[in-house]
A protein has these predicted regions:
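Conserved N-terminal alpha-helix of the aminotransferase class I/II PLP-enzyme fold
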Residues: 1-30, 40, 44
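Conserved PLP-enzyme active-site core in the AAT-like
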Residues: 25, 29-131
Length: 131
């Protein structure tokens, strides 16, 4: 496990981290990985941004493990509607629903259930603009 984590940290340029020591973990599947990611987002936002009432935004088509993780960790879940023709996340809705307590947004490539790809570049732009 340690060797795999070391390789992953190398691939992700962990040496560039300046505000702590990079770490990693191996999980047993997608649901566990998603749940651990949400916990990491929550804890990071609490420590670095002082967020005590976190929220997370995902498209309606996002994996249900995000719903479970938000429930387990007391994170408000905001579900973005999808375009009925493309089954992609509504980027304008996401932008309108981000606030100072948003710890992360997500998009899928490809999404759970439909197999379509959310507009990742546009979601990334919204995330960059909103911090």
């Amino acid at each position: 496990e340690g060797e795999v984590i070391a390789m992953a940290l190398d691939l992700m340029h962990a040496e560039a981290v300046t505000d702590g020591e990079p770490v990693g973990m191996v999980t047993t599947g997608g649901t566990g990985s998603i749940i651990h990611a949400l916990l990491a987002y929550r804890e990071h936002a609490a420590k670095h941004r002082g967020i005590t009432r976190p929220n997370f935004i995902k498209p309606e088509t996002g994996h249900p493990a995000f719903d479970k993780g938000c429930h387990l960790f007391g994170i408000e879940l905001r579900k973005a509607p999808i375009d009925p023709k493309t089954a992609q996340a509504d980027v304008d809705w996401v932008a309108d629903n981000i606030d100072e307590n948003t710890i992360a947004i997500m998009g899928s490539a490809c999404n759970y259930g439909y197999g379509t790809v959310d507009p990742i570049p546009e979601l990334g732009q919204v995330a960059s603009e909103r911090g």
